[in-house]
Amino acid sequence: MRPMTPRDKIRNFSIIAHIDHGKSTLADRLIQACGGLTDREMSEQVLDSMDIEKERGITIKAQTVRLSYTASDGETYTLNLMDTPGHVDFAYEVSRCLAACEGSLLVVDASQGVEAQTLANVYQAIDQNHEIVPVLNKIDLPAADVDRVKEQIEEIIGLDASDAVQISAKTGLGIPDVLEAIVNRLPPPRGGDHTAPLKAALVDAYYDPYLGVVVIVRVHEGILKKKQTIRMMRTGGVYEIDKVGTFNPKLTEADALGPGEVGYFVASIKEVGDCSIGDTITEDKRPTDKALPGYKDVQPVVFCGLFPMDAGDFDDLRAAMGKLRLNDASFTWEMETSAALGMGFRCGFLGLLHLEIIQERLSREFDLDLIATAPSVVYEMSMTDGTEIELHNPADMPDVVRITEIREPWIAATIYTPDEYLGSILKLCQDRRGIQIELSYVGGRACVKYELPLNEVVFDFYDRLKSISRGYASFDYTLIGHRAENLVKLQILVNEEPVDALAMLVHRDRAESRGRQMCERLKELIPRQMFKIPIQAAIGGRVVARETISAMRKDVTAKCYGGDATRKRKLLDKQAAGKKRMRQFGKVEIPQEAFVAALRMDGD
């Protein structure tokens, strides 16, 4: 068991970068340089533990690793690296990781420059008083333009980039310089008395099938040790610690963790939902008087229904959801039934990427075929009797007569784009009811700030933005609250039956065009039947658009040659009566592709 590290020999730091700028690769190189793993154990992106993280090249869960580094001054330092997610959906995880560190490496791709998500995280780091060391990655690429990117860092972020470390994480070039910069330019942990009552921040937690919940902590004051009884200040849970240790990057047991150290503990906690990220952990018998600042409850922003393709898979889906919830407390769900899709769940997510990842993990790790309904956001409603309600599912909207006001969530979006795509991007934002706040030019690129309704962004805004800008635009957003809007519920009726899975709330000005679009799309996608199928879009009791799928008809008069016309008439009338009866009792099956395609807004 190792002794506790003196505080002045500890460096806690995180790596901030936009998606694909080489953050996880740099982390791999640092682990390799410090001998954290042997070459045989080394795999690409050691810290991205989920397959899906490696495939998409993104970090979803924050990870930590402790490294020992002997610097050029002969001293041995303990480096605690926290690898944070880069995506906007996981902004809260990032903020908690940054709060556990004193410094950051800002990694910027020398061929691409500063992107929107880099900025969001850098500003968070600056708010936490971080010392920031700029690192220019991929300098071996032919397209790398080091001077231009240094200029961008100085102009956009306002950091001095003259002594930025230049590296290529892929080839390992410049990695020793990064390690020296961490030791010499980043500060050791501030304050922290080891005799004071325990005060530690809960940075993250994950579920291990053997150990149960493993909690990642950063100790600020006091000592965290085995057999100690601790209390979570937020949730009030009291636990006895079974194991304490650090990530090297494998779990390595220790006797205790002192001030400034980052490590883990295991304490027979049943599920990750019992641990709130950002909570303060203290001793049960001798608690600290004040919790650490910055905690907030993570609220789901986007909701959608998930239904099994085969109704028999419902129990498997429920079990799979329970397992995912063990590891991801920000994902919420409750059961719901849909007339069109049967039994399923209404799920809440932090954002669209989070939704996609959960869906993909359900189908990949649990081998489930799922139908997902259109993502929707949380609307607030003021009722005539003075009550306030939240609406998660447009199909459950109460009668319009009882509602005095509907408010929808708005976001402040920042978009960075090369100049040539600016026109199309402005048009996209205008089409989505956006309000332009600011347009500025920085380092040869346009920076557009817009306020947009989240409802308009939630389905395919990001895909459209990427396709318009050939992937060059980057996008970041923060929620700015709810605003009252003139919203109506658009219902789609197939064969005069409302399809609850296709119900949505839209702005009154756009309801008609949206309804027409949906009807036209469904007309192409629903297979023809033996009877006529009307497809209608309705607001309240008023139909605003209609398409009709014509019936397939058999030529019943083919066998009549000449002869009496009444014979033909009789056969045609018989066919018409049969079709009428079919239309009365016939159920129209809507194929899954029709659901998905009908929900994609812009036909391209």
From Swiss-Prot:
Record-level Gene Ontology MF annotations: GTP binding; GTPase activity; guanosine tetraphosphate binding; ribosome binding; translation elongation factor activity
Topology with respect to the bilayer: Peripheral membrane protein
Protein name as annotated: Elongation factor 4
GO cellular component, one term: plasma membrane
EC assignment: 3.6.5.n1
Residue stretches making up the tr-type G domain: 8-190
Catalytic activity: GTP + H2O = GDP + phosphate + H(+)
Keyword GTP-binding: yes
Entry's family note: Belongs to the TRAFAC class translation factor GTPase superfamily. Classic translation factor GTPase family. LepA subfamily.
Function: Required for accurate and efficient protein synthesis under certain stress conditions. May act as a fidelity factor of the translation reaction, by catalyzing a one-codon backward translocation of tRNAs on improperly translocated ribosomes. Back-translocation proceeds from a post-translocation (POST) complex to a pre-translocation (PRE) complex, thus giving elongation factor G a second chance to translocate the tRNAs correctly. Binds to ribosomes in a GTP-dependent manner.
GO terms classed as biological process: positive regulation of translation
Family annotation (InterPro entries): EF-4, EFG_III/V, EFG_V-like, EFTu-like_2, G_TR_CS, LepA_C_sf, LepA_CTD, LepA_IV
Record keywords: Cell inner membrane, Cell membrane, GTP-binding, Hydrolase, Membrane, Nucleotide-binding, Protein biosynthesis
Localization per record: Cell inner membrane
Record-listed GTP binding positions: 20-25, 137-140
